[in-house]
UniProtKB/Swiss-Prot annotation:
Residue stretches making up the Peripheral subunit-binding (PSBD) domain: 112-149
NCBIfam families according to UniProt: PRK05704.1, sucB
Species of the source: Pseudomonas aeruginosa (strain ATCC 15692 / DSM 22644 / CIP 104116 / JCM 14847 / LMG 12228 / 1C / PRS 101 / PAO1)
Enzyme Commission (EC) number: 2.3.1.61
Gene: sucB
Quaternary assembly: Forms a 24-polypeptide structural core with octahedral symmetry. Part of the 2-oxoglutarate dehydrogenase (OGDH) complex composed of E1 (2-oxoglutarate dehydrogenase), E2 (dihydrolipoamide succinyltransferase) and E3 (dihydrolipoamide dehydrogenase); the complex contains multiple copies of the three enzymatic components (E1, E2 and E3).
Cofactors named for this entry: (R)-lipoate
Entry protein name: Dihydrolipoyllysine-residue succinyltransferase component of 2-oxoglutarate dehydrogenase complex
Catalyzed chemical reaction(s): N(6)-[(R)-dihydrolipoyl]-L-lysyl-[protein] + succinyl-CoA = N(6)-[(R)-S(8)-succinyldihydrolipoyl]-L-lysyl-[protein] + CoA
Length: 409
């Protein structure tokens, strides 16, 4: 029985997809729940699995084709046998026996010479084995050597080797300056579209501050082993502290957690924090739902799970949809300072950066401290400068005195 292979049902936010990769060819056997084809959307790659054991009968939509929700991609013959493998080519006939050895040189490997002939040959620098003997039994006589010497004298001189041509300027091979044109992936095209949209539709501005990371680093160093043991291998990183600090600051400044819808301002009564994660396809932003209620361990576990799914290409559209505020950490790549771009319809994004030791003035003394620059990009249509600066200072204060996160002060 033929089974139709269809594209999945896309959410309302996804209009169509692109056939990225067929993992099977027509005639190949397929097992139930085995990956057949990948469909790339603006946000994620969706895997289409086989509904039953069988053989891939037909591919209707080829790689690179655009497909709609539930559109037919191909057909699977349930329970069919795979096409038989092509018979192996017949083994080549055995090579014929080697031909008889070429006749020996005129004088043989050990030519027979008279003492006088051998002495003359050595004086003339002639190999006796190269002289054809005319004596009895092929013996090389003195006359044979004399004849060989005369023949060598009368032989025309070898033409002189032509002088090497002057070196010419190097010529680049065609492949040294090759260009390759490939279509954008759907994710890259969507990112490009959204970034241009954000730049043109928002009154975007960035404010900066810096945070002393020593208190967080000391706390992490003191408890990281116990934390990992207590929470089944979940590692304590810096991102969880930033998420907790952000959720607390968002409670104090709800406008930073809001969005604009036409002429309305939508204040969200929840905090869904997007965390930028690097993947082979590019930067993706999965969302921690209701982050204000999550513990440090739950935040770290969620981020680690997102990172694993991103690496394996298994992030779902649900993982990537929504978000009321975003945190991006360019510091993991070595960025010292940047101006992150707001992801609409959100109105703000926090940028973390590289921790770097710098001399700082503390109580009149110069102290070397691990410092990090913070950047908050925001939509000035909704958020005033005072509110943005105060929000960033609140995050700074919470991170420099992490006990305040526990005491809610």
């Amino acid at each position: 029985m033929a089974i139709e292979i269809k594209a999945p049902t896309f959410p309302e936010s996804v209009a169509d997809g692109t056939v990225a990769t067929w993992h099977k060819k027509p005639g190949e056997a397929v097992k139930r729940d085995e990956l057949i084809v990948d469909i790339e959307t603006d946000k994620v790659v969706i895997e289409v699995l086989a509904e039953a054991d069988g053989v891939l009968a037909e591919i209707i939509k080829n790689e690179g084709d655009t497909v709609l929700s539930n559109e037919l991609l191909g057909k699977l013959n349930e329970g069919g046998a795979a096409a038989p493998a092509a018979p192996a080519a017949a083994a080549p006939a055995a090579a014929p026996a080697a031909q008889a050895a070429a006749p020996a040189a005129a004088g043989g490997d050990d030519a027979i010479l008279s003492p006088a002939a051998r002495k003359l040959a050595e004086e003339a620098g002639i190999d006796p084995n190269s002289i054809a003997g005319t004596g009895k039994g092929g013996r090389v006589t003195k006359e044979d050597v004399v004849a060989a010497v005369e023949a060598k004298k009368n032989a025309p001189a070898a033409p002189a080797k032509p002088a090497a041509p002057a070196a010419e300027a190097p010529i680049f091979a065609a492949g040294d300056r090759v260009e390759k044109r490939v279509p954008m992936t759907r994710l890259r095209a969507k990112v490009a579209e959204r970034l241009v949209e954000a730049q043109s539709a928002m009154a975007m501005l960035t404010t900066f501050n810096e945070v002393n990371m020593k208190p967080i680093m000391d706390l992490r160093s003191k408890y990281k082993d116990l934390f990992e043991k207590k929470h089944n291998g979940v590692r304590l990183g810096f991102m969880s502290f930033f998420v907790k600090a952000a959720t607390e600051a968002l409670k104090r400044f709800p406008g930073v957690n809001a969005s604009i819808d036409g002429n309305d301002i939508v204040y969200h009564g929840y905090q869904d924090i997007g965390v930028a994660v690097s993947s082979d396809r590019g930067l993706v932003v999965p969302v921690l739902r209701n982050a204000e209620f999550m513990s440090l361990a739950e935040i770290e576990g969620g981020i680690a799970n997102f990172g694993k799914k991103a690496k394996e290409g298994k992030l779902t559209i649900e993982d990537m949809t929504g978000g009321t505020f975003t945190i991006s950490n360019g510091g993991v790549f070595g960025s010292l300072l940047s101006t992150p771009i707001v992801n609409p319809p959100q109105t703000a994004i926090l940028g973390m950066h590289k921790i770097q030791e710098r001399p700082m003035a503390v109580n009149g003394q110069v102290v070397i401290l691990p410092m990090m620059y913070l950047a908050l990009s925001y939509d000035h249509r909704l958020i005033d400068g005072k509110e943005a600066v105060s929000f960033l200072v609140a995050i700074k204060d919470l991170l420099e005195d992490p006990a305040r996160l526990l005491l809610d002060v």
